[in-house]
């Protein structure tokens, strides 16, 4: 009898241990790994600004750690102001800046989306609040500096569980279980992930810094996703505008004409930002769904940018002078930049004579490596074969596309109408106060130097040569042409 009772107690104890073990595993899974649906946004614009493009799994940083890093490491930022000193934009008092999304995978994780590089800001005066323009090049954001700040913080001896939990406690009360998980799993894991990012992104250190408003979109794909050997090719280029994409689609959607499909361009951009292959598989499987909450996230991005229009020039325009400029434009510019976009086929680098580094950075070997990486997946992009031309982009919203040329090497349209030897050799990128006379952002002065990064056209990939069109015009014709370009 006693033996039977002892055996029964033993079985009960084993059962209790198993149940407790399963409960513990489910709890840990729920707190560390369980992925919840991404937040839903009613409008496509809000989705573009804050929605997920699948980067949280590979690149996501725990929200509470992300929030407190500028408070622990203010000395690693350009100045006081937290992430705003890197050009990140705040809108409507939201918890996250424009261009960052959050998805809960065990815990809330923060990562980039399309608007990080494609939402610009503009001010008429230094004291004004910024006007945020979705789809505009994010000329004010320092994407490389943002990544380097996160890496520098993780490399710092102050990146400890004690320091981070102490700062989190000043803002939010984690549960006892979450404090344990953060101390022993989440914080050490985040540090290791950021240090791996330092190793994976080492290819950037062999090239000139991007500076504000520029990025090498295909660098992460070449070296971090498809595993090409690191070389010295420089792919840094200006962040592109995303409006009127349907008009641009036939001619090519990147500076060098890669992709003639908006869908492919969106997928490639998400892949560059860190979207995982499983996420892309799942998202593309929903591409044909029409219900808003079940629709593909990237499909919503595509839908938003297909016919997105730029804002009008926000300063006075001399109508008579602009009318005279229209005649100059028809004679000097329309062959490549017709207002309807029909002529935007592109010119070979040898003809336009601009810096060719961006063209050389994507090769046949890289294209083949991408094909092997994507395999037979439904999201595999086409049109990634390297070419020898830069696209003659339509000029809609050209006023807010400064700096100019594919590598952002000319600060204003007035400067672009000068011969290359008379264009500024050094200027400051990233200041968002506008110069309506020269048609571009202010690129020198104390504030431009304080908030921006120096662009030196003597560095490889940064040359301001080429595109000599209009440089021989009389001064009055140039002035009229500038006035007309304000109307695009």
List PLM regions with ranges.
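Periplasmic c-type cytochrome electron-transfer domains
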Residues: 7-488
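Juxtamembrane low-complexity tails/linkers enriched in Ser/Thr-Pro and polybasic
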Residues: 1-5
């Amino acid at each position: 009898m006693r033996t039977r009772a002892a055996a029964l107690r033993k079985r009960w104890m084993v059962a209790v241990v198993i149940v407790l073990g399963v409960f513990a595993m489910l709890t840990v899974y729920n707190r560390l790994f369980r992925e919840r649906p991404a937040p839903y946004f009613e409008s496509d614009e809000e989705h573009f600004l804050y929605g997920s493009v699948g980067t949280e799994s590979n690149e996501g940083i725990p929200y509470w750690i992300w929030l407190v890093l500028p408070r622990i490491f203010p000395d690693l930022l350009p100045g006081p102001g937290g992430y705003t000193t890197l050009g990140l934009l705040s809108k409507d008092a939201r918890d996250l800046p424009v261009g960052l999304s959050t998805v809960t995978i065990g815990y809330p994780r923060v990562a980039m989306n399309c608007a990080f590089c494609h939402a610009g800001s503009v001010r008429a005066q230094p004291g004004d609040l910024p006007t945020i323009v979705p789809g505009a090049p994010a000329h004010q954001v320092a994407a490389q500096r943002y990544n380097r700040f996160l890496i520098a913080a993780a490399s710092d001896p102050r990146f400890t569980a004690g320091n981070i939990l102490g700062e989190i406690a000043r803002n939010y009360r984690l549960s006892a279980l979450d404090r344990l998980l953060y101390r022993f799993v989440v914080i050490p894991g985040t540090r290791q992930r950021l240090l791996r990012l330092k190793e994976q992104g080492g290819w950037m250190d062999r090239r000139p810094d991007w500076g504000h408003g520029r990025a090498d979109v295909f660098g992460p794909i070449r070296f971090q996703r498809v595993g090409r050997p690191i070389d010295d090719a420089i792919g840094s280029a200006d962040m592109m505008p995303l409006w009127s994409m349907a008009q641009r689609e036939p001619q090519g959607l990147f500076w060098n004409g890669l992709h003639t499909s908006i869908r492919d361009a969106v997928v490639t951009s998400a892949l560059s930002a860190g979207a995982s292959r499983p996420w892309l598989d799942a998202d593309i499987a929903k591409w044909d769904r029409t219900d808003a909450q079940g629709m593909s996230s990237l499909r919503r991005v595509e839908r938003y940018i297909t016919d997105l229009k730029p804002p009008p020039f926000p300063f006075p325009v001399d109508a008579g002078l602009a009318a005279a400029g229209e005649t100059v434009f028809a004679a000097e510019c329309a062959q490549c930049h017709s207002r309807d976009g029909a002529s935007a086929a592109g010119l070979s680098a040898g003809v336009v004579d601009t810096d060719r580094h961006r063209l050389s950075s994507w090769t046949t070997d890289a294209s083949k490596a991408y094909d092997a990486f994507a395999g037979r997946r439904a999201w595999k992009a086409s049109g990634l074969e390297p070419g020898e031309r830069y696209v003659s982009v339509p000029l809609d919203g050209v006023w807010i596309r400064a700096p100019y040329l594919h590598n952002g090497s000319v600060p204003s349209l007035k400067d672009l109408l000068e011969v290359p030897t008379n264009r500024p050799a050094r200027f400051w990128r990233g200041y968002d106060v506008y110069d309506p006379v020269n048609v571009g952002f202010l690129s020198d002065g104390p504030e431009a130097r304080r908030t921006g990064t120096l662009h030196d056209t003597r560095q490889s990939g940064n040359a301001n040569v080429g595109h000599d069109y209009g440089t021989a015009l009389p001064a009055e014709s140039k002035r009229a042409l500038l006035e007309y370009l304000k109307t695009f």
